[in-house]
Swiss-Prot record:
Function (record text): ATPase component of the INO80 complex which remodels chromatin by shifting nucleosomes and is involved in DNA repair.
GO molecular function, one term: histone binding
All copies of domain Helicase ATP-binding, residue ranges: 971-1143
Cellular component annotations (GO), alphabetically ordered: Ino80 complex
GO biological process per UniProt: chromatin remodeling; DNA repair; DNA-templated transcription; regulation of macromolecule metabolic process
Keyword Nucleus carried by entry: yes
UniProt feature, compositional bias: Polar residues: 40-53, 105-117
Organism in which the protein naturally occurs: Cryptococcus neoformans var. neoformans serotype D (strain JEC21 / ATCC MYA-565)
Record's comment describing the protein's domains: The DBINO region is involved in binding to DNA.
Protein name: Chromatin-remodeling ATPase INO80
Biased composition (Basic residues): 7-19, 495-507
Catalytic activity line of the entry: ATP + H2O = ADP + phosphate + H(+)
Residue window of motif DEAQ box: 1094-1097
C-alpha cells in the first residue's frame, strides 16, 4: 500500500503543469468531502469538529491557465499549495494531521458524504456577474489556426517560465495576506477593537482562504488561531449568497455586482473546457433562455464570546454557540443542495468528462445496450512495447461520456473524428498549435511527446485528442506506399483506429507501476484514478487504524443476495470494495446522472444502475471467491480485543447508518440532483469496518457518538450546577441575614449603652437591695406553690388510676368467666359433632377390629347414648346456636346435624369425583359391596354391612394377618371417601399395605389410576423396586431427575383426557416432596384417584409451603404413612388431621385450647389436670382416621430389640474445655433469656442459646471439633529449590537436598587453588599437604613418619605393633571417615567370629584360651522362660509418656541449613558437595531405596559397599531412642482416640463387635464428626460406607445394595435424618448412636432401619452418653417427648416432657438445683417477683463471652419448625440428581430457627418448677447483695467477653 507521502510525490509532477482553477468555474463541482484537516495543536478540538467532517477538495477540477494564476497569484482553494509551501511541508512532516492530496488534477477520491459549506475554511464561492462568454469551438480553433506556428520546445519553455512566475507571485501574495491578518489580529486585541474582524490563519494550512476570497476587506469568518482571542465570528451561511426555497425575494446577480469581487478571466488563453461545454449546450438549445443565477445576500455579522484556549475543561460554554453553529451548517447544506440542483451542467462538444477506465466504460455501455460485457482475461503484456503499438491500441471511441461517444458514432458517416475541441475533419486537420486540454500543450507538443515516449504531464484525454491524427498519419504513409488509398470500411467510410484505448492504459502504467500492483488493477474500482486513490488512502487508514502492516491487496469479494432480486452485497470487502459501494464522486454530477446514467449514487442513495430495467442490466456475480481473513491457507491470527471491539462498534454504526439512509438523507448528507429520492438497495456488512475516510481515526458516526457523550456530560455538569445554585443561594442568603441581624443587634446595643448607661447605674444603686430581697421571696413562694399543686395532682391521679384499674380488673374477670363458659360450650359442641362423625365412621370402617389383635388390649367403648339421640325429622327448625346459653340439648342437636352434613359432604365429594372420571370416558368402577347411601346418621348400627377384603391376586406376596386387616381398613376408607393415617410402628410393612390397596382397587374396582406416591428422596428407589417386585402389572413411572428429564416424562403422564386401563403407559407416578412442590402446577392438572404420602411427618408443619402445595392437589382420597404421627407437640397432630379432614379440623386454636394445653402440661407430672374423659374423647376422635399397631403386639417372629446406654467419663482435655465453657456461662443470664423466649422476644437470645448448646455437645463428642492438633514445624531460615514435574520421574525419583542457607559466605579463590584452606582429615584431604613442607615435614600421618617413629623408644606410634597393623593401614585408617572405620571394624569382627578359633569355651577340649584367664562366675537371676529385666525396662520406657518424641525433646523454634562457603571455582563446589553428600554414608544410614529393596543385584552391591549393614539402613533398624528427633511433629493417630472418651469407648466396642461377627450402623448428628470417624476407621482398617445429606440418590441406592449384599463391610456411617428414613438395612444387627437426636422419633426411625420386617437376629442398640454433661439431660428430655404420642395414641398418661424454658436446667447440677429451690422459697416468703427482660433492650448475653463458631448450626433442638426444615433437607438429600447433581451439602444439623408463631407460652406456665426456683434464687442473691431494689426489674451486670485460648495440647490456657 502506498503511503501518504508517496501520494504527495505522485501528485507533485502535475502541479508543475497546472495552476489553481477559478472558484467560479469550480462552483458546480463542490460535491463531496475529502479527509478532514489536521486540528490545531494549541487548542482543543471543538465539538463541531467531532460531529462534522472537515472540508475536502472537490472532484474533477481543471486548473486554470497560467496567465490566470499570474493575475490571481493565490493558491487554489481546492488543492494544497506546492511542496515548497511551509504549511504543506509541515503537514507532510506531521503524519497525525496529514492526509494525501489528490494525485491528479482531475479526481479527488473520497468515501465521505457530501460536505457542507461550513466544512471549508473559506467562504463559499460566488458566481460571476454574467455567464462567461467564449468563442465557439470552431471559431476558437480558427483563431488559433491563424496564428503563426511556434516551435514546440520554445512553447514548452515559455509555459514553464510562466508557471514559475505565477508560483512566485502566489507566494508573495500569501506572505502579504499573512502579514495583513497578523496586523488585524494585533489590532483586534487592543481596547475598543471588540467589533473588529479576526483575520487569523490556521497553522499548517494547505488551503489558504485568499484563493477563494481574493483581496477582500471582509475577512472576519476565520478559525481560532494558536494564540487565541476573546471573540470569534460565526461563519456565514450559504443562504447569504445562494437562494433557498423559502426565499420570497429573488434578485438577479447583476444587482449585487458591486458586492462580489470576481476577477476576469485572461484574454490570451481559451476558457476552461467546462465553460466551453456550457456554451456549446446553450448554443444547441437557443430556445432555452439563459437566466442569471439568483442570490439572496444577508449581511449579518454576529459575534459570540468564547473563553481563553488555556482554560481546559470549560468547553461547556461553547454549547449554545455550537448549537447555533450546527443549525447554520444544516441550513447551508440544504442551500447548497438546492443551488446545485438548479445548476444545469452540460458537457459540450470536445469537453473532457471524468476519465473512465475500461471496466467503467464497459459497465456504461452494457447499460446502454451497446456492447456486451467482456470477460476478464488476465494477460500480461511485455513491459517493452513500442509507442506505435501502444498508440495503435488506443480506444477508437472519443474521450468523454457514453453520450459523447454515441454522438461521435453518429458523426462517423460524415468522416468526422472527435478531438479535444470538437469534430475534426480528416481532410482539414487542426493546427498543430491548437491547445490540448487539460495539459495546456499544443497538439504538436503532445504528438512529439507521445512519439518520443515521454508521457509525463499528459493525461488520457491529451493522448486521445491526438491519437486519431497520429493514426491517420501512419495510415496515410502506408497508403502512400500502397497507392495513396486510406483504409476504408465496407460502407466506404474511412476506418478508424480499432479497439478501446488499451494503449493509453499501458502508457499510463509507466507512472502507475510504482503505485499499484497487477492484482489491484483488476479490482472493480481500480480502473479509475479516483478509485485507485481512494483504495490506497483507505488501505493506509485501515493499516493505521488496525496497527497492521500493508493491507492485503486484491482481496476478493464474497457477495450475498439481498431481498430484492439482482442486488448483491459484499460479505467481506476491503477498502476498494467499500469505496466502490459507497463512492459518492459521480452521484453529484447531475447532468451526467440525468443524461448518461453512468455512475453509482452517493452514500445513502441507491445506485443509478438500479433505476434501469432489470432486463437491460442483469446482475452477474463475481467469479472470485472470498475467504474470511485468517481462514484457509496460511497462518491465522486471532484479532486482538481492541480490534474485536472496533469491529462490533463499526458494525453497529454501519447498521445505524444504513437505517438512517433508508429513511432519507440526513442533515449532514444530501443527494444532489433533481428526481425522486432514491432508497438504499444494499446493506453492506463488513467483517472489518475500520475508518477508511478519516485520517484522524474518527468516523462520522463515531464523532456523533462522541458528541452525544460530551453533550451528556455537559448536561450532567450543568444540571449539578443548576441544582446547587438554589442551595448556595439559600446559604448565602442565610449568611447575609445573620450578618445583618448581628449588625443590627450591635447597633442597638451601642445605642443603649450610649444614651442610657448613666441612668441605669443610678437606678441600680438606689433599688439594688430591695430588688434582691423581693426576687428571693418570689422564687420561694412560686416553688412552694408548685410543690403543693404537684403533690395534690399526683394524689388525684393515683386515686383515679386505682379506681379505674379496679373497675377494669372486675370487668376483665367477668369477661374471662363468660368467655370461659362460652369457649367450653363451643368446644363441647365441636367435640360432640366430631365424636358423632368419628363414631359412625369408625363403626363403618371397623377401626376397632383392625386394631384388635392377639395380645393387644382394646378399650370397650362406652355407650354414651349416641344411638338414642333424637334429632328429629330432616329440616326441623332448630333454635339458633348461642354459646352464651345453657341449652345443652340444642348444642347436641346442632352438632348432630353438622356431623350429618359432614358425612354427606364427604360422600358427595367422592361421588362427584367418580362422576367426573366417568364423564371423561373412564371405565365404571365395580359395584361396591356397600353403598354410601346406607350410611344414615339416623340409624348408626351399620357395622354388619362393612366390606371384608381378601388379598388381591395380582399381589406377588403373602400378607400377614395384621397387614390383611390393615388392607381391609384402607379399603373401607376408600369406600366411604374418607382419608386416613396409617401410623403403624416402623418396620411393620406400611409400604406393602399401601401397595396392596392399589392392587385391590385395580383388581376389584377396575381403577388403574392415576395414583400418586410422594416419598422422601432416599426411598424413591425402594418404592420403585417394591412396586416392580410385588405388583408387576401396575406400571410405575419414576418422576425425578433434571428439569429436562422431567419435561420429557411429563409428556407421558400430563396428557389431557386420557383413560387409564391395564394397557395405559403408566398407573403410578412416584416423585419426591421437593419435586412435588416445584412442579405443583403440572400435578394440579391431573385428577388423582389416590395420593399416598410416605413419611408424612414431612408435612407436620401447617405453615410450610409443602403442606399448602400438597393440600391443593386434586385427588379423591389421601393416605398418610407415618410411624411417628406426633413428634413434638399436638400442633403436628392437628396438621395431619386437617390435611385429611379439613372440614372437621379447621381451627388449630380450638384444638390446641382443648387438647394441647392440658396434655402437654399434664405430661410434666406436676401441674397435670388432664381428665380421663378428655383423653377418651381424643382417642375416639382419632381412631376412625388413624390406625396404629406396634411390633410387640402383631409381630411374633421379629427378634427382640435391646437398648443399652453406655455412660462414659470425659477425658482430661474434654473436662478442661467443658469446665472453661461452664465457668463462662451465667445462670442468671440463662434464666433471663429463658423467660424472655417468647414470640416477641429478641431472636438473638434464642440463637445464642442454641449456639451455646452446640458448643457443649461438640465438647462431649470430640475436642477436635473446635481445633485440630496441627502439624508443628520450626521456622526454616533458608531457601528451597522448586521441584519439577513429579509425574515424569517414574518410580525412581531423585530428590537431592536443596536446602540453602540465606547467608552466603564468599571466600577468595586463592585459598582453594593455592592452599591455606582448612579441611577435615581424609584420604583426599589437602590439609597440610598443599606444599612440600606441609606434606612431608608437618604431616604426622604419612606412612614414612609412622614407620620411623615405631623404631624409636617411647614413640607415639608404638601401639601399631601391638594392634598388628601396618603403617600404611594405620595411615589410611586415620585419614578415613569415622563411618568407614566402623564398617571396617565390624567386618573384621564378623570375619574373626566366623573364621576364628574357639577361644571362649572353657569346657571345650581344644580350647586355646589362655590359662591365666578366670571364667566369669556371675549367677543368672532369671529362670528359663521368664522375661529379663532389660526387656521389662524397655517395655516400661516405651509405654511411658517420656518416650514420646515431643516429650523427649522440645522442638526448635527455628532451624537453618549449614552455611556453605562459596568460591568462584567449580572444583571447590564439587568438593563441597562430595563432603556433604557422601554416597557411602547416605547408603549406610538410609539403606536402599524402596524400589531397590527386592533387587538382588542392588542388594549384593550394597553388601559389598557396606558390609554388616541391613538393606534398610542403620536409622530404620535402630531403636527410636537412638535415632535423632525429627523437627517435624505430626500428631499421632492414637491421640485422636485418646482425646475423646466416646471415641475411645467406641474403639473398644468395635473391636468386640468385629470379633463377634456383627455388622454395625453408626449414626451421627454432625458431619464434621463423621469426618473424624472416617480417619479413625481408616486407621483401624475397617471397611465402611458413608451416607449423609450430600449423597446423591443414585449413590444412596448403590450403597444400600452393597450393604445388604456384601458382608465384608463392617460399619455403615449415616446421619440420623438422611439415613433414618425409608431404607432397609436389615443386614445389620447392631445400632450405635454416637450422639443422639433431640427428637426421639428420629432415633426410633433410625434404629428401625435394622429392626424391621425381615430381621431374624436380635438387634442391639448402643447409646454413647457423656456422664454428667448436657447430653445426659438432653436424652432425658428427648425421652420425655416420646411420651406425648404414648399419651395420644397409646395408654401412657404421665411422663416428663421438656419445655423450652427448662433448657437452663441442662447446665445445672443437682446440687445447684436443690440450692435454687431453697432460695426460691425464701424469695417467695419475701414476696419477690422474678424480673423480666425488656425485649427491645440490648443486654449482655450469656453467650457473648463465648466467641466460638459452632460450625454445625442448630439441629432443631428447641424448635419444631427448625426440625421440620432439617428433616425436609435431609430426606430430600440436597445432593440429589434432579437439580444440582450433588451440589450443596446438607448438614446433619439444620440451620438456626426461631419459635413458630402461635406457640405462645407465658412465663408462669412455660417455666418448669426447677427453672422458676433457679430464677427466684438468682434474683434473691442480687437483692441481698444490695445491687437492686425489690419489685424492680433491673438487668444483670454485663458479662465480660472472654475468648477461650487453647494451648498446643488443645486444653484451655
Amino acid at each position: 500500500m502506498a503511503d501518504h507521502h508517496d501520494s504527495r510525490r505522485r501528485y507533485s509532477h502535475t502541479r508543475h503543469h497546472s495552476a489553481s482553477k477559478s472558484p467560479v468555474a469550480l462552483m458546480d463541482r463542490i460535491v463531496e468531502r475529502s479527509p478532514p484537516l489536521h486540528p490545531q495543536p494549541s487548542s482543543r478540538m471543538s465539538l463541531s469538529a467531532l460531529v462534522n467532517d472537515s472540508p475536502s477538495p472537490p472532484r474533477r477540477i481543471t486548473p486554470p491557465p497560467a496567465a490566470y494564476a499570474e493575475r490571481h497569484p493565490h493558491p487554489s482553494a481546492y488543492y494544497p499549495s506546492s511542496t515548497t509551501d511551509p504549511g504543506y511541508m509541515g503537514a507532510m512532516d506531521d503524519r497525525r494531521y496529514s492526509y494525501p492530496p489528490p494525485r491528479t488534477s482531475y479526481v479527488q477520491p473520497s468515501t465521505h458524504p457530501s460536505p457542507t459549506a461550513s466544512d471549508y475554511r473559506y467562504r463559499s464561492p460566488v458566481l460571476p456577474q454574467h455567464p462567461p462568454t467564449h468563442h465557439s469551438p470552431s471559431s476558437y480553433s480558427a483563431s488559433l489556426y491563424g496564428q503563426p506556428k511556434e516551435d514546440p520546445a520554445i512553447a514548452y519553455a515559455r509555459m514553464r517560465e510562466e508557471m514559475r512566475t505565477a508560483e512566485e507571485a502566489r507566494r508573495e501574495a500569501e506572505a502579504l495576506e499573512y502579514r495583513r491578518k497578523r496586523d488585524m489580529e494585533f489590532a483586534a486585541r487592543r481596547p475598543g477593537s471588540e467589533l473588529m474582524d479576526d483575520p487569523r490563519r490556521i497553522p499548517h494550512s494547505s488551503f489558504p482562504r485568499s484563493q477563494m476570497y481574493g483581496p477582500s476587506a471582509d475577512q472576519s469568518r476565520v478559525m481560532p488561531s494558536r494564540n487565541g482571542k476573546d471573540y470569534i465570528s460565526e461563519p456565514p451561511s450559504p443562504s447569504e449568497l445562494y437562494p433557498t426555497d423559502e426565499d420570497t425575494e429573488r434578485l438577479p446577480i447583476d444587482r449585487y455586482r458591486r458586492d462580489i469581487d470576481v476577477p476576469p478571466l485572461p484574454r490570451q488563453l481559451p476558457p476552461p473546457p467546462s465553460e466551453i461545454g456550457r456554451m456549446a449546450d446553450r448554443a444547441r438549445s437557443p430556445s432555452a433562455p439563459i437566466a442569471p443565477p439568483l442570490l439572496k445576500v444577508v449581511r449579518k455579522r454576529t459575534k459570540v464570546i468564547r473563553p481563553n484556549d488555556f482554560l481546559v475543561g470549560n468547553e461547556d460554554v461553547w454549547e449554545d454557540g455550537l448549537i447555533r453553529y450546527q443549525s447554520k451548517r444544516e441550513d447551508e447544506v440544504r442551500a447548497i443542495a438546492q443551488w446545485a440542483a438548479s445548476c444545469q451542467v452540460r458537457n459540450g462538444v470536445g469537453e473532457p468528462s471524468l476519465p473512465q477506465t475500461q471496466d467503467e466504460s464497459i459497465k456504461v455501455r452494457k447499460i446502454n445496450g451497446d456492447i456486451a460485457t467482456p470477460t476478464n482475461k488476465k494477460k500480461r503484456k511485455s513491459r517493452k512495447l513500442n509507442l506505435d503499438d501502444e498508440l495503435l491500441g488506443l480506444a477508437s471511441s472519443p474521450p468523454g461520456s457514453p453520450n459523447a461517444a454515441a454522438e461521435a458514432e453518429k458523426s462517423e458517416s460524415k468522416h468526422h473524428i472527435y478531438g479535444m475541441n470538437g469534430p475534426i475533419d480528416p481532410a482539414n486537420p487542426p493546427s498543430p498549435s491548437t491547445i490540448v486540454y487539460p495539459s495546456g500543450l499544443t497538439r504538436a507538443e503532445v504528438i512529439a511527446k507521445c512519439e518520443a515516449g515521454d508521457v509525463e504531464g499528459l493525461t488520457e484525454d491529451d493522448v486521445k485528442a491526438v491519437q486519431d491524427e497520429m493514426w491517420m498519419r501512419e495510415k496515410a504513409a502506408q497508403a502512400a506506399e500502397n497507392g495513396g488509398v486510406l483504409p476504408t470500411n465496407k460502407d466506404g467510410t474511412v476506418r478508424r483506429k480499432p479497439g478501446p484505448a488499451k494503449g493509453w492504459r499501458k502508457i499510463r502504467g509507466i507512472d502507475k507501476k510504482k503505485e499499484t500492483t497487477p492484482g489491484k488493477a483488476q479490482s472493480t474500482t481500480a480502473g479509475s484514478v479516483a478509485g485507485s486513490v481512494a483504495d490506497e488512502e483507505a488501505e493506509a487508514d485501515i493499516a493505521a487504524l488496525l496497527d497492521d502492516s500493508i493491507a492485503k491487496k486484491g482481496k476478493k469479494v464474497k457477495r450475498r443476495k439481498l431481498e430484492e432480486p439482482g442486488a448483491e452485497s459484499p460479505r467481506f470487502a476491503d477498502a476498494e470494495d467499500e469505496y466502490n459501494e459507497h463512492r459518492p464522486s459521480d452521484s453529484v454530477l447531475l447532468d451526467e446522472i440525468e443524461d448518461e446514467h453512468s455512475r453509482a449514487g452517493s452514500v445513502g442513495e441507491s445506485n443509478a444502475l438500479d433505476t434501469l430495467p432489470a432486463a437491460s442490466a442483469p446482475p452477474k456475480k463475481k467469479n472470485s471467491k472470498t475467504k474470511e481473513p485468517g481462514v484457509g491457507k496460511g497462518r491465522w491470527t486471532r484479532p486482538t480485543k481492541p480490534e474485536k471491539e472496533l469491529v462490533k462498534k463499526a458494525e453497529a454504526l454501519a447498521s445505524r447508518t444504513s437505517k438512517a439512509s433508508l429513511a432519507g438523507p440526513s442533515d449532514d448528507t444530501f443527494g444532489v440532483g433533481p428526481g425522486p429520492a432514491e432508497e438504499v438497495q444494499e446493506e453492506i456488512k463488513h467483517e472489518y469496518a475500520p475508518n477508511t475516510h478519516d485520517p484522524r481515526g474518527v468516523s462520522e458516526n463515531e464523532a456523533k457518538i462522541r458528541h452525544e457523550l460530551v453533550e451528556d456530560l455537559q448536561k450532567q455538569a450543568w444540571s449539578n450546577i443548576v441544582r446547587d445554585v438554589p442551595r448556595i443561594y439559600r446559604v448565602f442568603q442565610g449568611y447575609d441575614q445573620s450578618m445583618k441581624q448581628i449588625a443590627q443587634r450591635r447597633a442597638q446595643a451601642c445605642v443603649r449603652n450610649a444614651f442610657g448607661q448613666r441612668n441605669q447605674k443610678t437606678m441600680q444603686r438606689q433599688s439594688g437591695k430591695v430588688n434582691k430581697e423581693g426576687a428571693a421571696k418570689a422564687k420561694r413562694i412560686v416553688k412552694e406553690l408548685a410543690a403543693f399543686w404537684r403533690k395534690n395532682e399526683k394524689d388525684e391521679v393515683i386515686a383515679r388510676k386505682k379506681a379505674e384499674r379496679e373497675a377494669l380488673e372486675r370487668a376483665k374477670a367477668e369477661e374471662e368467666a363468660r368467655e370461659t363458659k362460652r369457649q367450653s360450650r363451643k368446644l363441647n359442641f365441636l367435640l360432640t359433632q366430631t365424636e358423632l362423625y368419628s363414631h359412625f365412621i369408625g363403626k363403618k370402617i371397623k377401626t376397632k377390629e383392625a386394631e384388635a389383635a392377639e395380645g393387644m388390649d382394646v378399650e370397650e367403648e362406652e355407650k354414651r347414648g349416641m344411638e338414642e339421640i333424637a334429632i328429629g325429622e330432616d329440616g326441623e327448625p332448630l333454635p339458633d346456636l348461642d354459646y352464651d346459653e345453657d341449652d345443652e340439648e340444642n348444642l347436641r342437636k346442632h352438632a348432630a346435624r353438622g356431623a350429618q352434613a359432614a358425612i354427606q359432604a364427604a360422600r358427595d365429594k367422592a361421588r362427584a369425583f367418580d362422576d367426573s372420571i366417568v364423564g371423561r370416558g373412564a371405565p365404571l368402577p365395580g359395584d361396591d359391596t356397600m353403598d354410601g347411601d346406607e350410611l344414615n346418621f339416623q340409624n348408626p348400627s351399620l357395622g354388619e354391612n362393612s366390606v371384608t377384603i381378601t388379598q388381591p391376586k395380582m399381589l406377588m406376596a403373602q400378607l400377614k394377618e395384621y397387614q390383611l386387616k390393615g388392607l381391609t381398613w384402607l379399603g373401607n376408607l376408600y369406600e366411604q371417601g374418607i382419608n386416613g393415617i396409617l401410623a403403624d410402628e416402623m418396620g411393620l410393612g406400611k409400604t406393602i399395605q399401601s401397595i396392596s390397596l392399589l392392587a385391590y382397587l385395580a383388581e376389584h374396582h377396575n381403577l388403574w389410576g392415576p395414583f400418586l406416591v410422594i416419598a422422601p428422596a432416599s426411598t424413591l428407589h425402594n418404592w420403585q423396586q417394591e412396586l416392580a417386585r410385588f405388583v408387576p402389572r401396575l406400571k410405575a413411572l419414576p418422576y425425578w431427575g433434571s428439569p429436562k428429564d422431567r419435561e420429557t416424562l411429563r409428556k407421558i403422564w400430563s396428557r389431557k383426557n386420557q383413560t387409564f386401563s391395564e394397557d395405559s403407559p403408566f398407573h403410578i407416578l412416584i416423585t419426591s416432596y421437593q419435586l412435588a412442590v416445584q412442579d405443583e402446577k403440572y400435578l394440579q392438572g391431573m385428577k388423582w384417584q389416590y395420593m399416598i404420602l410416605d413419611e408424612a411427618q414431612a408435612i407436620k408443619s401447617s405453615s410450610s409451603a409443602r403442606w399448602k402445595s400438597l393440600l391443593s392437589l386434586h385427588c379423591r382420597n389421601r393416605l398418610l404413612l407415618t410411624g411417628t404421627p406426633i413428634q413434638n407437640s399436638m400442633h403436628e397432630l392437628w396438621a395431619l388431621l386437617h390435611f385429611i379432614m379439613p372440614q372437621l379440623f379447621d381451627s388449630h386454636e380450638e384444638f390446641a385450647e382443648w387438647f394441647s394445653k392440658d396434655i402437654e402440661s399434664s405430661s410434666g407430672g406436676v401441674t397435670g389436670n388432664l381428665k380421663p374423659e378428655q383423653l377418651k374423647r381424643l382417642h375416639m376422635i382419632l381412631k376412625p382416621f388413624m390406625l396404629r399397631r406396634v411390633k410387640k403386639h402383631v409381630q411374633k417372629e421379629l427378634g427382640d430389640k435391646i437398648e443399652i446406654d453406655l455412660l462414659v467419663d470425659l477425658s482430661q482435655r474434654q473436662r478442661e474445655i467443658y469446665k472453661a465453657l461452664r465457668q463462662r456461662v451465667s445462670i442468671t443470664d440463662l434464666l433471663a433469656t429463658a423467660e424472655n423466649n417468647t414470640d416477641n422476644g429478641n431472636p438473638k437470645n434464642m440463637r445464642s442459646l442454641v449456639n451455646l448448646v452446640m458448643q457443649f455437645r461438640k465438647v462431649c463428642n470430640h475436642p477436635d471439633l473446635f481445633e485440630r492438633a496441627d502439624v508443628v514445624s520450626p521456622f526454616v531460615f533458608g531457601e528451597f529449590s522448586q521441584s519439577g514435574n513429579l509425574a515424569r520421574e517414574g518410580d525412581g525419583m531423585y530428590l537431592p537436598d536443596s536446602a540453602r542457607n540465606a547467608i552466603e559466605v564468599q571466600i577468595p579463590r586463592i585459598l582453594w587453588t593455592d592452599g591455606g584452606k582448612l579441611d577435615i582429615p581424609g584420604e583426599q584431604s589437602l590439609a597440610g599437604s598443599d606444599t612440600k613442607i606441609l606434606q612431608n615435614l608437618l604431616n604426622i600421618w604419612t606412612p614414612e613418619w609412622i614407620n620411623e617413629r615405631t623404631k624409636c623408644a617411647d614413640a607415639e606410634f608404638g601401639f601399631v605393633k601391638l594392634v598388628g597393623s601396618s603403617p600404611g593401614e594405620t595411615s589410611r585408617s586415620a585419614k578415613s571417615p569415622v563411618l568407614v572405620q566402623l564398617l571396617e571394624g565390624a567386618e573384621k569382627e564378623r570375619r574373626w567370629t566366623e573364621e576364628g578359633r574357639f577361644v571362649d569355651d572353657s569346657e571345650f577340649a581344644a580350647s586355646v584360651k589362655k590359662g591365666f584367664r578366670v571364667p566369669s562366675v556371675i549367677p543368672v537371676l532369671t529362670q528359663p522362660g521368664q522375661v529379663s529385666l532389660r526387656e521389662i525396662s524397655r517395655r516400661v520406657w516405651d509405654e511411658s509418656y517420656l518416650s514420646r518424641d515431643d516429650a523427649r525433646c522440645i522442638g526448635d523454634y527455628a532451624i537453618a541449613p549449614i552455611v556453605k562457603p562459596i568460591a568462584s571455582n567449580r572444583s571447590f563446589l564439587n568438593a563441597q558437595d562430595r563432603i556433604l553428600n557422601q554416597p557411602l554414608a547416605h547408603s549406610t544410614l538410609y539403606g536402599l531405596a524402596p524400589s531397590e529393596l527386592h533387587d538382588p543385584l542392588a542388594a549384593e552391591q550394597f553388601s559389598r559397599i557396606a558390609p554388616s549393614v541391613p538393606l534398610t539402613g542403620l536409622i530404620p533398624s535402630s531403636a527410636s531412642s537412638q535415632t535423632p528427633v525429627s523437627p517435624l511433629h505430626i500428631p499421632p493417630t492414637k491421640r485422636l482416640i485418646v482425646d475423646s472418651a466416646k471415641l475411645a469407648r467406641l474403639d473398644s466396642l468395635l473391636r468386640e463387635l468385629k470379633a463377634g461377627g456383627h455388622r454395625v450402623l453408626l449414626y451421627f448428628q454432625m458431619t464434621k464428626m463423621m469426618d473424624l470417624i472416617e480417619e479413625y476407621l481408616i486407621f483401624r482398617q475397617y471397611k465402611y460406607l458413608r451416607l449423609d445429606g450430600s449423597s446423591p440418590i443414585a449413590e444412596r441406592r448403590d450403597m444400600v445394595t452393597s450393604w445388604q449384599t456384601n458382608p465384608d463391610i463392617f460399619v455403615f456411617c449415616l446421619s440420623t435424618r438422611a439415613g433414618g428414613l425409608g431404607i432397609n438395612l436389615t443386614a445389620a444387627d447392631t445400632v450405635i448412636f454416637y450422639d443422639h437426636d433431640w427428637n426421639p422419633s428420629s432415633d426410633a426411625q433410625a434404629m428401625d432401619r435394622a429392626h424391621r420386617v425381615g430381621q431374624t437376629k436380635q438387634v442391639t442398640v448402643y447409646r454413647l452418653v457423656a456422664r454428667g454433661t448436657i447430653e445426659e439431660r438432653i436424652l432425658q428430655m428427648a425421652r420425655g417427648k416420646k411420651d406425648i404420642q404414648d399419651v395420644v395414641v397409646g395408654t401412657k398418661s404421665v411422663s416428663d416432657v421438656a419445655k423450652p424454658s427448662e433448657i437452663v436446667s441442662l447446665f445445672m447440677d443437682d446440687e445447684e438445683l436443690a440450692e435454687s429451690v431453697a432460695k426460691r422459697k425464701q424469695a417467695e416468703a419475701h414476696g419477690y417477683i422474678a424480673p423480666t427482660i425488656i425485649p427491645n433492650g440490648r443486654r449482655s448475653q450469656f453467650g457473648d463471652g463465648l466467641v466460638l463458631d459452632d460450625g454445625e448450626g442448630d439441629d432443631g433442638f428447641f424448635n419444631a419448625a427448625a426440625a421440620a426444615r432439617a428433616n425436609a433437607e435431609e430426606e430430600e438429600g440436597l445432593g440429589a440428581e434432579e437439580e444440582s447433581k450433588g451440589k450443596g451439602k446438607a448438614k446433619a444439623a439444620a440451620a438456626v430457627t426461631f419459635p413458630v408463631p402461635g406457640e405462645k407460652r407465658s412465663h408462669k406456665k412455660g417455666m418448669g418448677k426447677k427453672a422458676q426456683a433457679a430464677a427466684a434464687a438468682a434474683a434473691l442473691e442480687r437483692v441481698i447483695a444490695g445491687n437492686e431494689e425489690p419489685l424492680a426489674a433491673s438487668k444483670p451486670p454485663a458479662k465480660k467477653k472472654v475468648k477461650i485460648a487453647l494451648g498446643p495440647d488443645g486444653l484451655p490456657l
